[in-house]
């Protein structure tokens, strides 16, 4: 396995920079509109690059900056990983989707993600560096899960017959990225757990774990939702992770029951 001499990470806030430092990660403050000399220098030394910044209306600001200088900006780079979203597939009427399925994004943010995937892949080809595109399902983990929503009074059991969502624990995102890094893999990979599930079932489990009554079920037609929340319910698909598992990756949390139960038992659900 690859062992890093050092790891650096960007953040937009001083508070999160301190948290990175406590984890042994060199923190770098990132702000769109240009790289600091420290960030430019770190990129010149970097051998592996993992990106998760969402593209804006004008595209990916990091890619735009690197593209100005090409290989000279990242002379030691050996591998690029771009974290995208399964939202690029759009709606498939609850059918299974693989990496070969047609991408037909609905939202503007998913359209931008798809275009950015293509742009990073082109950049990798131009500088002869392999690029792995990781299409992530709905992320949960410490501080971001149904137990937190329940504790804050924000959890709702909205029922739309047949609707399922796909999920992935944050530990499995890190695990999959590390596995693909060690394999020097390139191409597109779905990063999702084994069990697409109705969202109301996840809230019910959170209530069971915490020993409280679950909130009442609300028919989708009667639910008051923000435009973004409603957009999620306009898409339904079952994301296959067979390609990732075919490369030998074993999920730490293959379904939401195991992931949520572990968060509760360890107390890490709070973040």
Give a label for each model feature.
Residues 139-149, 158-181, 187:
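Substrate-positioning beta->alpha
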Residues 174-177, 182-229, 271:
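Mid/C-terminal beta-alpha module of Rossmann-like enzyme folds, strongest
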Residues 39-82:
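NAD(P)-cofactor binding segment of oxidoreductase domains
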Residues 68-108:
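Conserved Rossmann-fold NAD(P)-dependent oxidoreductase catalytic core, especially the SDR/UDP-sugar
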Residues 93-133:
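Catalytic helix-loop patch of NAD(P)-dependent Rossmann-fold dehydrogenases
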Residues 204, 224-250:
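Conserved C-terminal active-site "lid" loop/helix of NAD(P)H-dependent oxidoreductases
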Residues 255-271:
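Amphipathic terminal alpha-helices
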Residues 23-46:
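Conserved Rossmann-fold cofactor-binding substructure of NAD(P)-dependent oxidoreductases
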């Amino acid at each position: 396995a690859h062992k890093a001499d050092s790891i650096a990470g960007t953040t937009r806030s001083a508070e999160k920079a301190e948290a990175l430092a406590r984890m042994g990660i060199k923190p770098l403050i990132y702000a769109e509109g240009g790289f600091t000399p420290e960030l430019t220098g770190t990129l010149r030394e970097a051998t592996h690059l993992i990106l998760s910044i969402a593209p804006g209306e004008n595209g990916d600001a990091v890619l735009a900056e690197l593209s100005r200088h090409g290989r000279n900006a990242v002379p030691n780079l050996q591998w690029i990983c771009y974290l995208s979203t399964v939202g690029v597939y759009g709606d498939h009427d609850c059918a299974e989707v693989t990496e070969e399925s047609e991408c037909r994004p609905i939202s503007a943010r998913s359209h931008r993600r798809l275009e950015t995937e293509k742009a990073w892949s082109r950049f990798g080809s131009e500088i002869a560096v392999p690029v792995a595109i990781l299409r992530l399902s709905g992320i949960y983990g410490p501080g971001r899960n149904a137990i937190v929503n329940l504790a804050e009074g924000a959890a709702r059991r909205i029922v739309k017959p047949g609707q399922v969502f796909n999920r992935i624990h944050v530990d499995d995102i890190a695990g999959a990225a590390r596995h693909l890094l060690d394999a020097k893999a390139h191409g597109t990979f779905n990063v999702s757990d084994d069990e697409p599930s109705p969202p109301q079932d996840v809230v019910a489990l959170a209530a069971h774990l915490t020993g409280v009554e679950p909130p009442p079920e609300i028919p989708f037609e009667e639910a008051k939702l923000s435009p973004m929340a409603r957009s999620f319910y306009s898409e339904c698909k079952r994301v296959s992770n067979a390609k990732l598992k075919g490369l030998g990756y074993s999920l730490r949390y293959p379904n939401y029951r195991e992931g949520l139960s572990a968060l509760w038992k360890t107390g890490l659900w709070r973040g």
